[in-house]
Structure formats: structure tokens, C-alpha cells
Amino acid sequence: MSHNFHVIIPARYHSSRFPGKLLQEINGITVIERVYRQALLAEPKSVIIATDHDEIADRAIQFGAEVVITSHTHQTGTDRIAEVIAKGSFAPDDVIVNVQGDEPFIRPKLIQQVACSLTKTKAPVSTLCWPISSLEILNNPNVVKVVCTRDNHALYFSRSAIPFHRDDKNAYSNTFRHIGLYAYRAAFLLEFVSWPPCTLEQIECLEQLRILWSGFSIRVDEACEEPLQDINTKEDLILAQQYFLDTFNV
């Protein structure tokens, strides 16, 4: 049974920290194929890989994926997804889930959760968060933090430690990290990418701040399952390979 949403996976080859990571293998299967397989398990109406790289496109076609070739000038995965929507036959209200191409163990239930959340909110975007479990994570600028209203809408996203525990600098209770999984309405996504980057976005290097800056809301739900590590570095790949061996007893 398919659900009423589409998954688009932006797949960029030239990552700044780990170029070519999507074509690295975990037990003989590339990272991008593992992401694609996990997305299929969420039972969406379609799964599309959006890329500007010939080798990624060729490999994706070989394992049976629908591929859309996009411009090489895009600065973000969201821009790449918007091109797919503009080229396709999506309805304005279609739910589009942005699944990052470097998450080989993305949980299908999280994809379903973020898509379902969008259908139950007036916000044009939904995303997820997870409780922070250590001071090290809280103070890591590569981990994006989010603070929310009492009705689960984002107040702010930051690479800094928010909220700041004034009276106990070693505390991390009631802090949440953002999970980079988004659902949007197709029409809103096209509108979003037409806006110029805002000041806060440029300072933090977080494009979702453009949405808040422009006066729109983002629904944020706590993930129903703990998210697993994405792959940003060679060290992350080694950890992912070991996780696979440990989990599946290969």
C-alpha cells in the first residue's frame, strides 16, 4: 500500500567534507542505493533521485531508481528538489519529503511520520527533532539545535547551544537536535526557493531560517524512533560499515 506523498533524494557528488560519499559502499551496496531502499520501505507514491552527476545517475538507473538530471549550479538540496518539482507533474498540494542522500539507514517510519505531520498542520513545512543526550552534542556546531513553541512550531534553529542554561552550563535537559528530514507542499517549496537568502540563514548557514524569517511556521515533532547517523566524513562511513556488521551479524 502506497502513502500519499513523494520522496525526492537530492544526490550531490561534490560534498565539501567527503566528495563521492554517496558512491561509497556499505557491505557491497552504495550509500545512495541504501537510502533509496529505505525510502521505498516507507511506501511513498514515488521515489526520485535528483542529481547532476553522471556516475550517480548511471548507478541509480542500474538499481532501478527514477532519476532526474538537475543543474550543477544548485547551492542546496532544496533547490535541486524544486527543479524536479518544476519539471514534473506534481499538484500544488502534493506532499514532498526531502530525504538526504547520505542517510543509508534512514528509518522508514520517520519518513512516514514527517509526511503525515504535514497533512495535520497548517504550517507549510514539517520536520523532526530528537532529545540531546550529552553536553558534547549540545556544544557541537555541526549539530543543529531547535527550540519550539508549546504547540510544536519552531522558534529558532541554531548551531549554538539553545536554550542556554544560565545557572548550569553543564546541563542539557530540554534541548533538542534537529533531524534534517523535511516535508513540504510542492507549491510552497517552489515559492521558498524563489526568496533570496536572509541574514540569519547566511550567518548560521541554515536555509530553514529563511522560512521563519519570511513569517512562515515550521512544524517540529519529536521523532517516533531514534534517528541513525548520517555520513559526512570518512570516519562516519567506517562507523556505518561497522554498524551494519554489528546489526546484521554479517
Swiss-Prot record:
Stored CDD domains: CMP-KDO-Synthetase
Domain of life: Bacteria
Catalytic reactions of this protein: 3-deoxy-alpha-D-manno-oct-2-ulosonate + CTP = CMP-3-deoxy-beta-D-manno-octulosonate + diphosphate
Keywords: Cytoplasm, Lipopolysaccharide biosynthesis, Nucleotidyltransferase, Transferase
GO biological process, one term: lipopolysaccharide biosynthetic process
Enzymatic class: transferase
EC number of this enzyme: 2.7.7.38
InterPro entries: Cytidylyl_trans (IPR003329), KdsB (IPR004528), Nucleotide-diphossugar_trans (IPR029044)
GO cellular component annotations of the record: cytosol
UniProt keyword annotation of NADP present: no
Pathway membership, UniProt: Nucleotide-sugar biosynthesis; CMP-3-deoxy-D-manno-octulosonate biosynthesis; CMP-3-deoxy-D-manno-octulosonate from 3-deoxy-D-manno-octulosonate and CTP: step 1/1; Bacterial outer membrane biogenesis; lipopolysaccharide biosynthesis
Localization per record: Cytoplasm
One Pfam entry name: CTP_transf_3
GO MF entries: 3-deoxy-manno-octulosonate cytidylyltransferase activity
Annotated family: Belongs to the KdsB family.
UniProt function note: Activates KDO (a required 8-carbon sugar) for incorporation into bacterial lipopolysaccharide in Gram-negative bacteria.
Family annotation (PANTHER family): 3-DEOXY-MANNO-OCTULOSONATE CYTIDYLYLTRANSFERASE (PTHR42866), 3-DEOXY-MANNO-OCTULOSONATE CYTIDYLYLTRANSFERASE, MITOCHONDRIAL (PTHR42866:SF2)
The protein, known as: 3-deoxy-manno-octulosonate cytidylyltransferase
Native organism: Legionella pneumophila subsp. pneumophila (strain Philadelphia 1 / ATCC 33152 / DSM 7513)
